[in-house]
Amino acid sequence: MRSFVGYEKGINFGGWFSQCEHTKKHYDEFIGESDFAAVSSWGIDHVRIPIDYDLIENGNGDIQESGMMYIQQCIDWCKKYRLNMILDLHKTCGFSFDEGESESGFFESEELQERFFRLWEEIAKRFGKYHDCVAFELLNEVTNKEYCDIWNEIADKCIFRIRTIAPETYILIGCLLYTSDAADEARSV
């Protein structure tokens, strides 16, 4: 198996920008620069930063600069402490794996899929230049086998659109069923 150099010993900073109370106070206090320094001192080589779409876009799909600034701050701290980063879109408009939310139209709606593509294009425009230390994870844990084929189609289209902007950035695609042993249900894209 090929090594994913720089992404072999990591930690997940969950609960900061995803599955959380989406307030400035929470974003500013839950995790900070000292946490990045600490994990670097432990020999960790990367952090995974899950984000919900509502950190970086409003209900109409317009970009929220304040959320993009938090991502930039994470990248700056990663660079300062010699860490790589996986930017994980944990939830997108129309889809969440969270209990009680689940799928709400993303896999059926071309409009929501287009919104997802535009969001990733914006992320690629802003952060693709950090391909030496930032990888993109398209969507966290697609959980239902019935979405396998459509998820592969969506991922293909999204990768193509990201690649036109950020051709060197690593892109991660999780398998179905909470990224478990369901690799036989997904194909390589």
Annotate each PLM feature.
Residues Y178-S188:
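Single conserved hydrophobic/aromatic residue that forms the stacking wall/gate
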Residues R2-Y170, C175:
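Active-site mouth of glycoside hydrolases
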